[in-house]
């Protein structure tokens, strides 16, 4: 039997140094090619953890990166497979993110923005000429070759890039990053190269004023803005921007992809090709100031998403929101109404803990550019977990009014207290709110274990989880009850409502039972002493 030889070319030819970045299945480290002393960045992928689909994506990324050779694109120099690992050896770019460099500059003008977007357009044009659509153009993927003044802008991360034939339009899946998605992707229409030009329009808008054209903390409303092309050029910051710059943005942010400007056409636009005479040279300090806040918000959001659901331990106090100076809050939805304002202090949440949340946001620090199908699904699943937490908070607080707002009037339920019967409507549950929950002032803490969310189309979802309820019994001893729950949610008029639930195990919210002289708890009356929703 012939012996198999394991490839060790990377191990033999390269020396690894410090870590530069990390993702779910990969790490990026500085490395040196031993024979030449040349330094590179090695993206090291743990292939033992990859699915067959992930292997295909890795092969596609390597194939695309090998094809693209341009001064404004981070170049792939080598692709090596070894036992359990795959190594992609890229240019070592040391200048950091373009947007971070801009805010450190003493002088920044419209002409500088023109030069930045020109380099981005050059990279996009090269991709499109080679039949590649990047699909994830955003600030995190725009790097500088070095820290030297005037260093080249380099487009990075082709993990979502696809290969297309000419001007082919097809449905390649929901991919990208929310604020940079094009209307056609959100409509789930066939798409192609124009999606990159839409993202360029968003980037150019930010380069000129320091905040994005489309903004809403609520992803659904953000998508509605994008699909409607609902952006403008508000005063006073846009008053000092030349008409030619606005014209180029309008051509990039054209809703109809067939009429949207191409990369090659954009490079010929007067604001790019005749920068010296067309673009303003005035220093834009307000843009720099706004961009600092924009960068801080991006970094904060990434950090929050990374740690958000490791464990969530909420205060037993009522939800509070401290409003920082200058932040406008919509009290109904706790939405920041302007992207130019300061970063809001997060609201405290009810006393519910989510543990081991496989369906929540677990962002890698590599980038937020997982497929938006994954991203969108994660966001929608998180919405379901959130509204489930709110429902349980209403139960814990004995707040029947809040409960009825979250539940459908025709709510159906199977639960132990109904003795196998299907309960319909709110009257069965009203009894417990009025006679038990409202009279209980004992602290209650609920833990949701292992929530799993199944999305059923756009407007329906099912969540299954284990619910642990901690409380103090009549003698002051700590107790815990467990139930297994499934809830079905339906979205009507943009609002999620619980339409059905099925619960097994113990009832979930304790009511202090009477005590008999020997100290033993009396559960006479059966389960009617326990809240059952």
Swiss-Prot record:
Residues modified to N-acetylalanine: 2
Regulation: Activated by Ca(2+)/calmodulin. Binding of calmodulin results in conformational change that relieves intrasteric autoinhibition and allows autophosphorylation of Thr-287 which turns the kinase in a constitutively active form and confers to the kinase a Ca(2+)-independent activity.
Region annotation (Disordered) ranges: 337-375
Gene3D superfamilies documented for this protein: 3.10.450.50, 6.10.140.620, Phosphorylase Kinase, domain 1, Transferase(Phosphotransferase) domain 1
Signal peptide positions (record): none
Catalytic reaction equation(s): L-seryl-[protein] + ATP = O-phospho-L-seryl-[protein] + ADP + H(+); L-threonyl-[protein] + ATP = O-phospho-L-threonyl-[protein] + ADP + H(+)
Residues with Phosphoserine modification: 315, 319, 364, 367, 438, 524, 528
EC number: 2.7.11.17
Region (Autoinhibitory domain): 283-292
Cellular compartments per GO CC: sarcolemma; sarcoplasmic reticulum membrane
CDD domains for this protein: STKc_CaMKII
InterPro entries, alphabetized: Ca/CaM-dep_prot_kinase-assoc, Kinase-like_dom_sf, NTF2-like_dom_sf, Prot_kinase_dom, Protein_kinase_ATP_BS, Ser/Thr_kinase_AS
A GO term for molecular function: protein serine kinase activity
Modified residues annotated as N6-acetyllysine in this record: 318
Membrane-topology annotation of the record: Peripheral membrane protein
Similarity comment: family membership: Belongs to the protein kinase superfamily. CAMK Ser/Thr protein kinase family. CaMK subfamily.
Annotated protein name in UniProt: Calcium/calmodulin-dependent protein kinase type II subunit delta
Source organism: Oryctolagus cuniculus
């Amino acid at each position: 039997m012939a012996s198999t030889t394991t490839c060790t070319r990377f191990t033999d030819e390269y020396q690894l140094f410090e870590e530069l970045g990390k993702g779910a299945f990969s790490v990026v480290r500085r490395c040196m090619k031993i024979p030449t002393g040349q330094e590179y960045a090695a993206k090291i992928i743990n292939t033992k953890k990859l699915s067959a689909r992930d292997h295909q994506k890795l092969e596609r990324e390597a194939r695309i990166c090998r094809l693209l050779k341009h001064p404004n694109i981070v170049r792939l120099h080598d692709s090596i497979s070894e036992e359990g690992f795959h190594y992609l050896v890229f240019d070592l770019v040391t200048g950091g993110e373009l947007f971070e460099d801009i805010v450190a500059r003493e002088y920044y003008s419209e002409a500088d923005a023109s030069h930045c977007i020109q380099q981005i357009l050059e990279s996009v044009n090269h991709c499109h000429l080679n039949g590649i659509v990047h699909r994830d153009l955003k600030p995190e993927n725009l790097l500088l070759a070095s820290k030297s003044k005037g260093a080249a802008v380099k487009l990075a991360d082709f993990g979502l890039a696809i290969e297309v034939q000419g001007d082919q339009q097809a449905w390649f899946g929901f991919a990208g990053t929310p604020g940079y998605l094009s209307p056609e992707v959100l409509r789930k229409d066939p798409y192609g190269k124009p999606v990159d030009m839409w993202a360029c329009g968003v980037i150019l808008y930010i380069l000129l004023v320091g905040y994005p054209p489309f903004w809403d903390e609520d992803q659904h409303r953000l998508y509605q803005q994008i699909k409607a092309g609902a952006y403008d050029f508000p005063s006073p910051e846009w008053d000092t921007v030349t008409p030619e710059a606005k014209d180029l943005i309008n051509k990039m942010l054209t809703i109809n992809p067939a009429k949207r400007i191409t990369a090659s056409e954009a490079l010929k636009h007067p604001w790019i090709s005749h920068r010296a005479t067309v673009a303003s040279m005035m220093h834009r300090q307000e843009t720099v100031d706004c961009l600092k806040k924009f960068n801080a918000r991006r970094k904060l959001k990434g950090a929050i998403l990374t740690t958000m659901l490791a464990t969530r331990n909420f205060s037993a106090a009522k939800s509070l929101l401290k409003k920082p100076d200058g932040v406008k809050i919509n009290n109904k939805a706790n939405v920041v109404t302007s992207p130019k304002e300061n970063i809001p202090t997060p609201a405290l949440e009810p006393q519910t803990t989510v543990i081991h949340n496989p369906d929540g946001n677990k962002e890698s620090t590599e980038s937020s550019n997982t497929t938006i199908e994954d991203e969108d699904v994660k966001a929608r699943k998180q919405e379901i977990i959130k509204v489930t937490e709110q429902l349980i908070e209403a139960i814990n607080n004995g707040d029947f009014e809040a409960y009825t707002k979250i539940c459908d009037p025709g709510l159906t339920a199977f639960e132990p207290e109904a003795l196998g019967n299907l309960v319909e409507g709110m009257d069965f549950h009203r009894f417990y709110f009025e006679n038990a929950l409202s009279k209980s002032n004992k602290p209650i803490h609920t833990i949701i274990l292992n929530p799993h969310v199944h999305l059923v189309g756009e407007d329906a979802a099912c969540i299954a989880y284990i619910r642990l309820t901690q409380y103090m019994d009549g003698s002051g001893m700590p107790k815990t009850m467990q139930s297994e729950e499934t809830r079905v949610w339906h979205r009507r008029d943009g609002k999620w409502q619980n339409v059905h639930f099925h619960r097994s195990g113990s009832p979930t919210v304790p009511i202090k039972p009477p005590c008999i002289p020997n100290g033993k708890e009396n559960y006479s009356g059966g389960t009617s002493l326990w809240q059952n929703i």
